Curated annotation (Swiss-Prot):
Pfam families the record matches: DUF3950
Originating organism: Escherichia coli O157:H7
InterPro entries (UniProt xref): DUF3950
Gene encoding the protein: ylcI
The name this protein goes by in its record: Uncharacterized protein YlcI
Amino acid sequence: MSTKNRTRRTTTRNIRFPNQMIEQINIALDQKGSGNFSAWVIEACRRRLTSEKRAYTSIKSDEE
C-alpha cells in the first residue's frame, strides 16, 4: 500500500458505489445539512459493524 495514502490513524481506500446510491447519499446529506460524504460512510460502517458484532455475540452465546 502506498504510504502517501496513509496517515498515522487513517488509510485511504478507493471503492466504487453505484451511481444511484451516490445520488441517494447526496440527497440524505443535503437534507441533513451536512455535506461530509466520508463521515456519512464511516458512520454507516460503524453501525454495520456494531450490528454484526451483536449478531455474532448472540450466535456464539447460543452455541455455548
